[in-house]
């Protein structure tokens, strides 16, 4: 804590500085830098440290550090504000709350593909960490000395949030000398309880349940629901053995490197051990059903460095329920003639969405009740239908007709965000440059996410020619509900023949520049939820295709 006098001086000084509003990820990172959770880091990495971390998993001082913690900005921030080496800037939250000053020592443009290959072992943007790096992270990194001013504010669960020094003090008060950390980004069920408690008892230690409440994988269950589940599962551990503390970490889903990173962080929080299980911090499977990392690759990497970083690993294989024994066992220990039971995260979500039974052997009834309250069935969740296609493809006509049709039997509020309507009321000052088109789609995505978050249906029908902005919307909206991308794939020749607004003719004559499909590209979706070519079908038939898809997938009933 700094004095009120010094805080006032900092605020007055900040009025004369350029400000950078931090993203959610950057806020997570700076909070953990300032608290000491990212020790030995004192600030965002400079260029030399960045290169050393990417290539060698070490800082230039020689200390192990596997994940680059960088502050990314766009080129316009540098050029518009005359940013150069030695410039001091103010770092703020979205509401303007002053966090820190940064005196810049490094400005560089990284090779993000090289970074992706080194950190994630992949450049496939189906991987959420790779996608964030290549499609969302800005093109310029800046590093330098931080002047800490105020930690980011949290209004939720203040009694469950601890800095490393606070948590170490708690351990001392309770007389805990050996502490096993259990990392999770999902609700805990019976198998997780068995793994965590067995890990602690094996090494005669106490247990810290240390879930991530910063950014996790897109589509994960929100942290409010998860924390309520963690609080309930605490009752199933013997009294005095287990503690819950929340970690405001922004995960990268980097598998082996992330496991090593998690070990370093938990060491800083005073833990002596960490549980590392199957595919720790992995993002799941790629679009072809293949894993990005070996099942125990994370364990192997942490084991290699555990002595050096000062934390021991408690490794666990996958746990399954054995019906004949009525208990959980490591999968490799189950005799072949016995039945192994398990429910994946995907299957659990399917059961919740469709009101199917969730057996007692899998989880506790109070956890199921909590999940059901926060995870209604599909037909009661918020939904965004995002149409994309060339001008004249039929997307606006289908979207309008679909809105009217759905209102016949839908209880959820339905909002149409048509491209022309949005341009008139939400983006009237924007032109048609790539930057402005992306901004227009981002605005549509934000409005749709708010509609979806509140249980409504948003029907969006812009051209949305660029894959990157569509993907950003998908990620944003998927945090709050369901996202359906509908590609109206009517070919250019058909759209140009229709040309109801005469725009194609003007584009061919050079009267309109940067017209999608003529002299500006349309990037077709690679894997849309639904694809419709309206060349040889009526509007009613196209609308019916969408209705049937929504019924089949359980989004409407």
Named regions from a protein language model:
Residues 1-379:
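Active-site cores that bind ATP or allylic diphosphates and position pyrophosphate for catalysis
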Residues 322, 489-545, 553-557:
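Small-molecule kinase domains that catalyze NTP-dependent phosphoryl transfer to phosphate-bearing small molecules
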Residues 387:
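Hydrophobic anchor at the beta1->P-loop junction of P-loop NTPases
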Residues 390:
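P-loop (Walker A) phosphate-binding loop of NTP-binding proteins
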Residues 396:
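Walker A/P-loop
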Residues 425-431, 448-508, 514:
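ATP-dependent NMP and nucleoside kinases share a basic, alpha-helical "lid"
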């Amino acid at each position: 804590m700094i004095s009120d006098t010094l805080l006032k001086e900092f605020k007055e000084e900040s009025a004369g500085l350029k400000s950078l509003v931090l993203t959610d990820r950057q806020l997570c990172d700076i909070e953990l830098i300032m608290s000491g959770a990212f020790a030995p880091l004192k600030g965002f990495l400079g260029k030399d440290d960045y290169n050393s971390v990417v290539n060698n998993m070490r800082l230039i001082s020689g200390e192990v550090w596997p994940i680059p913690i960088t502050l990314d900005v766009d080129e316009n921030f540098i050029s518009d504000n005359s940013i150069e080496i030695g410039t001091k800037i103010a770092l703020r939250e979205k509401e303007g709350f002053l966090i820190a000053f940064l005196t810049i020592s490094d400005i560089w443009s990284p090779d993000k593909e090289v970074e992706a290959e080194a950190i994630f072992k992949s450049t496939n943007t189906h991987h959420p960490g790779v996608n964030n790096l290549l499609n969302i992270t800005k093109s310029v990194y800046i590093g330098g000395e931080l002047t800490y001013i105020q930690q980011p504010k949290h209004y939720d669960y203040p009694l469950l949030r601890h800095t490393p020094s606070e948590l170490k003090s708690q351990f001392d008060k309770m007389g805990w000398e050996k502490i096993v950390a259990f990392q999770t980004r999902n609700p805990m069920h019976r198998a997780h309880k068995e793994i965590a408690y067995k890990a602690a008892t094996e090494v005669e230690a106490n247990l810290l349940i240390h879930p991530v409440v910063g950014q996790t994988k897109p589509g994960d269950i929100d942290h409010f629901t998860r924390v309520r589940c963690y609080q309930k599962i605490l009752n199933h551990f013997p009294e005095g053995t287990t503690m819950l503390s929340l970690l405001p970490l922004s995960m990268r889903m980097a598998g082996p490197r992330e496991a090593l990173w998690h070990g370093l962080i938990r060491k800083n929080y005073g833990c002596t051990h960490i549980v590392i299980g199957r595919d720790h911090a992995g993002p799941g499977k790629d679009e072809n059903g293949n894993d990005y990392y070996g099942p125990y690759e994370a364990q192997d990497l942490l084991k290699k460095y555990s002595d050096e970083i000062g934390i021991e690993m408690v490794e666990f294989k996958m746990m399954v329920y054995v019906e004949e024994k009525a208990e959980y066992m490591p999968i490799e220990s189950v005799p072949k003639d016995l039945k192994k039971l398990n429910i994946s995260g995907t299957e659990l979500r399917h059961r919740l969405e469709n009101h199917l039974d969730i057996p007692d052997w899998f989880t506790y009834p109070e956890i199921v009740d909590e999940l059901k309250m926060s995870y209604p069935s599909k037909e009661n969740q918020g939904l965004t239908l995002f149409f994309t296609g060339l001008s004249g493809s039929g997307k606006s006509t289908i979207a309008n007709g679909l809105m009217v049709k759905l209102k016949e039997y839908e209880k959820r509020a339905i909002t149409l965000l048509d491209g022309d309507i949005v341009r008139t009321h939400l983006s009237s000052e924007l032109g048609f440059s790539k930057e402005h088109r992306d901004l227009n789609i981002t605005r549509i995505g934000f409005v749709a996410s708010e509609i979806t978050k509140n249980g409504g249906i948003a029907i969006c029908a812009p051209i949305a020619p660029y894959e990157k902005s569509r993907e950003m919307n998908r990620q944003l909206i998927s945090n709050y509900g369901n996202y359906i991308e509908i590609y109206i794939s009517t070919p250019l020749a058909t759209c140009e023949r229709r040309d109801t607004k005469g725009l194609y003719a003007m584009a061919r004559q050079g009267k309109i520049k940067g017209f999608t499909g003529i002299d500006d590209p349309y990037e077709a979706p690679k894997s849309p939820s639904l694809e419709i070519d309206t060349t040889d079908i009526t509007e009613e038939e196209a609308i019916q295709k969408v209705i049937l898809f929504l019924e089949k997938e359980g989004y409407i009933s």
